[in-house]
A protein has these predicted regions:
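Juxtamembrane inter-helical linkers in multi-pass membrane proteins
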Residues: 96-115
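Loop-to-transmembrane boundary segments
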Residues: 69-72, 111-135
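N-terminal signal-anchor/start-transfer transmembrane helix
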Residues: 2-26
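A generic, lipid-embedded transmembrane alpha helix
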Residues: 31-57
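Alpha-helical transmembrane spans of integral membrane proteins, capturing the lipid-embedded, hydrophobic core
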Residues: 6-7, 36-44, 76-80, 84, ...
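Juxtamembrane boundary at the C-terminal end of a transmembrane helix
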Residues: 133-147
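Short alpha-helical packing/oligomerization segments
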Residues: 64-102
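Transmembrane alpha-helix entry/boundary detector in multi-pass membrane proteins
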Residues: 1-4, 24-39, 64-75
């Protein structure tokens, strides 16, 4: 079961990292903040559901219910954080280039040509690093935890 959840969450993470939505509008930033609230609310709902399963149906112990509640909520928080990391990297880079366009106009053409030349490769490298981090996080969450 742990392998299944590892593969599912890693697949979701890779989809979120590589889906191409690297820049957010204000509406999408608000949605991202609401997703954090929903993840935290979902943690309580999942916790009560697993506790109910353990007490009424005796499917597993309360300790196992707490364990799975924790690792599922941590997995969703990791998904949220990974997408946030990719979007923040792209946003910070865009802000730096925008700053140079306004406040460093005499050198903006040089910087712009360099960023156009190396920017896509750096974005791919950053996404590869975040993907590797996702693999390490979900491996640690799902495959090294013992109940």
């Amino acid at each position: 079961m742990n392998w299944l959840f590892f593969i599912v969450f890693l697949g979701l993470a890779l989809f979120l990292i590589w889906n191409g939505k690297d820049r957010f509008s204000k509406k999408e930033w608000v949605r991202m903040a609401l997703m954090l609230g929903l993840i935290l609310l979902g943690t309580f709902i999942i916790g009560f559901f697993f506790k109910w399963l353990s007490l009424s149906l005796s499917m597993f112990s309360i300790a196992a219910a707490r364990h799975y509640t924790a690792i599922i909520s941590i997995s969703f928080l990791c998904l949220w954080g990974l997408k946030l990391a990719v979007v923040l990297l792209c946003t910070i880079f865009a802000w730096i280039i925008g700053f140079h366009e306004v406040h460093n106009a005499e050198n903006y053409q040089k910087i712009s040509s360099i960023s156009n030349k190396f920017g896509p490769g750096l974005l791919i490298a950053a996404k590869c690093l975040v993907s590797f981090g996702a693999f390490l996080m979900f491996y640690g969450i799902w495959l090294t935890a013992a109940v």
